[in-house]
Curated annotation (Swiss-Prot):
Membrane topology classification: Multi-pass membrane protein
Entries under Pfam families matching the protein: UPF0259
Keyword Transmembrane: yes
Family stated for the protein in its record: Belongs to the UPF0259 family.
Subcellular location: Cell membrane
UniProt name for this protein: UPF0259 membrane protein bbp_256
Species for this entry: Buchnera aphidicola subsp. Baizongia pistaciae (strain Bp)
Length: 250
């Protein structure tokens, strides 16, 4: 069977149209989880970020701004960064786990009930959380070196959550299998990743440039948009993985 990016995109749009209520619900829940956790554990750090944004012209970079802070303020900012990363990690894991499980159940024509919103075993959720944390750290290290290494790791690791949940492999085996499959199907996977990344950058620029909403609402809308486009990418990658020849998955 010949697989093309256009055919996968059409399948993705068709699935999105037929299952959009549940997909939107997952997006709303994951965005709410991220924003609520962030607002609970990082309420005092926003004043530092707001101060930096107001006087951004005084500083050449965020590092220059950090050097002007007291030790306590630096600790607070570090805590805020870790907490924000944690909230994003939890929200992303919730979205990935539930959406992949839902698509898998739909593909096997299983009955969908309200339990789908809490259908992931805790061990599987924690395992997926570890996988996303590991791949995120490696990707961020890649971006610290240069854009190309970071972007390449995003592509190579893109199928690992799907493989982890469907094949029930270990974290390292899921990453290894994802790398092998993406290298063999670069032309199919890369366009979707580029579209997803460009959309994320576009949304971040739009929301950061236009100050129509409060910081809380703007952050929620940002997460909402990013999670929605991420859902489309997950559907695309899931469909891609399922129709690949079996010998490529081993």
């Amino acid at each position: 069977m010949h697989i093309t990016a256009n055919s996968l995109f059409r399948d993705t749009i068709h699935f999105l149209r037929s299952k959009w209520p549940i997909i939107v619900t997952f997006v709303l829940l994951s965005s709410t989880i991220t924003v609520v956790i962030d607002s609970i554990i990082t309420p005092n750090a926003r004043s530092l970020l707001a101060f930096y944004q107001l006087d951004i012209k005084k500083y050449h970079s965020l590092l220059d701004f950090v050097r002007t802070l007291t030790i306590d303020q630096q600790k607070l900012l570090l805590y805020a960064s870790i907490a924000k990363s944690f909230s994003l990690l939890i929200g992303s894991t919730f979205l990935l786990g539930n959406l992949i499980t839902f698509i898998q159940m739909t593909s096997y024509k299983k009955n969908i009930t309200l339990s789908i919103f809490n259908n992931i075993p805790y061990k599987t959720f924690f395992k997926l959380l570890q996988l996303i944390f590991t791949t995120t750290i490696i990707t961020q290290l890649g971006f610290l070196l240069y854009f190309i290494p970071g972007f390449t790791t995003i592509i190579l690791f893109s199928l690992s959550p799907i493989i982890l949940l469907i094949e029930e492999k270990t974290i390292l085996n899921s990453i290894y299998a994802s790398i092998n499959i993406t290298l063999s199907n670069f032309k199919i996977i890369v366009p979707a990743i580029i579209f997803w990344l460009c959309f994320k950058i576009f949304i971040i620029l739009i929301i950061s440039y236009f100050k129509f909403f409060s910081d809380f609402l703007a952050y929620f809308i940002l997460n909402l948009c990013i999670n929605f486009i991420s859902s489309i990418l997950i559907i695309y990658l899931f469909r891609c993985y399922m129709i690949l020849p079996k010998f490529l998955k081993n």
